[in-house]
């Protein structure tokens, strides 16, 4: 196995990003950092804030939380003044805070639409965690609100900005694998009782919303196509009370216009390593830990030299690339590479998957 240095992978990522995002990288960035208000101070927000601390383009300038003691503690870590700490009731006062250019929405899924729309009305750009929201109608309202307010909306698909995923896309686009025939992608974990993700009202659905969406989105960005047919099956195996509201397991297949067939599985009932494997007429590639925060590894066999590369970058590097991209777009008035429309499309496919599996959403 070849283990690249951080510098090697940073260079690879920069080259891949330059090829993919060439128009945006031609503009000059502002010397002023983009100020973020972080809405929700849970685990994923911690990853994001630690990343922004390392950024030369972004900074944390406000916090929004229902727990003032926690917010005060985090504010001290990031140099956020007391006057820039908000709760969910007075959040709209952020309109008068010039230090806040954008908000990062890191709340339960059911709250994404409300706070994206409120942020847009306050004139703030929005970086919203995935899944975008609960349904297509909410996604459309979020996009409309941001367009009306003339602010940018980006969905936090961090894998779009990660070098190993970009390396896989580059190999596929170059024709190294020949004509892609099929893709496999599972991802899941054994969820603990009592998590908010088991509430349909808060989460919108089960593992498909939470982790299955990684596989769904990966198949779309790997093929560069949109699925034209979807079939799905769902099941509950562990009747232990966890899955009274959401599915435990769901599997689906997608056929793309070129004929590529993708097979995906997600679960809340078992630890299922997240990866994708792409089969082509001239070879194959696989990315292990494809959706993890670190430890991504790409292997490939085709008519060229075999590939076995481990990305040495550590968490929160994905979040840093994501934040830097959005800040660059804000500073240079550019459209993000994963805009609201990307989330809207996934919400449409999630709806199709659930309908095919006989699940009402």
Task: Label every PLM stretch briefly.
Residues 83-145:
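Beta-loop-alpha module in the N-terminal Rossmann-like domain of NAD(P)-dependent dehydrogenases
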Residues 12-79:
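N-terminal Rossmann-like dinucleotide-binding module
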Residues 3-4, 8-30, 102-104, 326-361:
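C-terminal helix-rich "cap/oligomerization" subdomain common to oxidoreductases
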Residues 133-194:
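A contiguous active-site-proximal alpha/beta segment in oxidoreductase catalytic domains
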Residues 87, 128, 153-155, 264, ...:
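Hydrophobic residues in well-ordered beta-strands that form the structural core
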Residues 236, 240-246, 255-322, 339:
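NAD(P)-dinucleotide binding in Rossmann-like oxidoreductases
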Residues 193, 197-261, 265-271, 341:
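Rossmann-like dinucleotide-binding domain that binds NAD(P)(H)
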